[in-house]
């Protein structure tokens, strides 16, 4: 088992990071009925850990007895029937799913499937809360239609169902949904908090950490606790005992994006654009989110660019990220940004060096 799963806090009392939020959640569910909740914050900040600990606080050990199912449904959509398939993670009292996995059909997931689950109260309550919890991941990636359907579902089945929504950015969630939830902002942990967790993991694994080693891992983690723990485990596999100057390797996909940035700086041509497109597609196939690719690519380019170009390149990166949110095929928008950058950079080189 990966350390990131092995040492994930199982209850609100054992949470190391965000202790204040954990105690407020504990008080909330013990004193009154839990409202709909919206957890939002950067990836790796600990949203999912808090949600799972909260479920255990509400339902006890039964919340940990989960099973993974690939479920299929037939949904009537006017004159035709749509076949939907989605992976769910469920226990007696809660169901977890990611409706945005259904793509443009996400509104049918929200309309029909959540409705079906919300109608059924948990049978085996044993004196616990008489409602079922639906955990919806990546709510910020739902289409507008799906979010409107979700709002109606929240109102209609609030007596038998509570929704816990999870997303990276609340700005992409409609005000109608946000106003019906208690919004819980989960900030990225500080470097000091990450160091504290790494030292806790190292102690549990009986590892000796050199002076400043945990701080170096925390610094390279970009304030992602998940990434920091994975990096520590990777370093343990690569070389132990640790050394003070041990290299903390970047992730493979980050090195690959750095190569793409170097290619874009070296040559600006249709041939190179085609090669870059292939590399970007390879990253997408390996499940690297398109917005993460674009953000990392911009980061690598800014390290190499002249200061007078940085503002314009940032503008176009933001423009194509926005276009990517509105469209369906992410590869088109990343490729468009690459082409735009090549055009800007080539014109800059011509005007500077002739």
Curated annotation (Swiss-Prot):
ATP binds at residues 41-48. Keywords: ATP-binding, DNA replication, DNA-binding, Nucleotide-binding, Nucleus. Transmembrane segments: none annotated. One of its GO terms (biological process) is DNA replication. GO terms for molecular function: ATP binding; ATP hydrolysis activity; DNA binding. It comes from the Eukaryota. The keyword Zinc-finger does not apply. Pfam families: DNA_pol3_delta2, RCF1-5-like_lid, RFC_C. It is found in: Nucleus. GO terms for cellular component: nucleus. Belongs to the activator 1 small subunits family. Heterotetramer of subunits RFC2, RFC3, RFC4 and RFC5 that can form a complex with RFC1. May be involved in DNA replication and thus regulate cell proliferation. This is Replication factor C subunit 3. It comes from Arabidopsis thaliana. The gene is RFC3.
């Amino acid at each position: 088992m990966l350390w990131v799963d092995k040492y994930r806090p199982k209850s609100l009392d054992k949470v190391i990071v965000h202790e204040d939020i954990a105690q407020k959640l504990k008080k909330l569910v013990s004193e009154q009925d839990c409202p709909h909740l919206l957890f939002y914050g950067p990836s790796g900040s600990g949203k999912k850990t808090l949600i799972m600990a909260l479920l255990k606080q509400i339902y006890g050990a039964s919340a940990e007895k989960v099973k993974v199912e690939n479920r299929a449904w037939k949904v009537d959509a006017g004159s035709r029937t749509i076949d939907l398939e989605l992976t769910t993670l469920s226990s007696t009292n809660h169901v977890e799913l990611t409706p945005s996995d259904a793509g443009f059909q996400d509104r049918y997931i929200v309309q029909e499937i959540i409705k079906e689950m919300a109608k059924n109260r948990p049978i085996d309550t044993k004196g616990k809360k008489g409602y079922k919890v639906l955990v919806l991941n990546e709510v910020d990636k739902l289409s507008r239609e799906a979010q409107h359907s979700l709002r109606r579902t929240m109102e209609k089945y609030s007596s038998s169902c509570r929704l816990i929504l999870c997303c990276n950015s609340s700005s992409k969630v409609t005000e109608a949904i946000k106003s019906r939830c208690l919004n819980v902002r989960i900030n990225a942990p500080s470097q000091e908090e990450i160091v504290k967790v790494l030292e806790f993991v190292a102690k549990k694994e009986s590892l000796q950490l050199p002076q400043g080693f945990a701080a170096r891992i925390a610094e390279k983690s970009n304030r992602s606790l998940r990434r920091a723990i994975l990096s520590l485990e990777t370093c343990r596999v690569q070389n132990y005992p640790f050394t003070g100057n041990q290299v903390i390797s970047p992730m493979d996909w980050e090195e690959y994006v750095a190569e793409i940035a170097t290619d874009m700086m070296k040559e600006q041509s249709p041939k190179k654009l085609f090669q870059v497109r292939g590399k970007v597609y390879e990253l997408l196939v390996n499940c690297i989110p398109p917005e993460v690719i674009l953000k990392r690519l911009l980061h690598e380019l800014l390290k190499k660019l002249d200061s007078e170009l940085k503002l314009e390149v940032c503008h176009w990166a933001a423009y194509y990220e926005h276009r990517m949110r509105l469209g369906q095929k992410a590869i088109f928008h990343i490729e468009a940004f690459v082409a735009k950058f090549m055009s800007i950079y080539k014109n800059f080189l011509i005007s500077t060096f002739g």
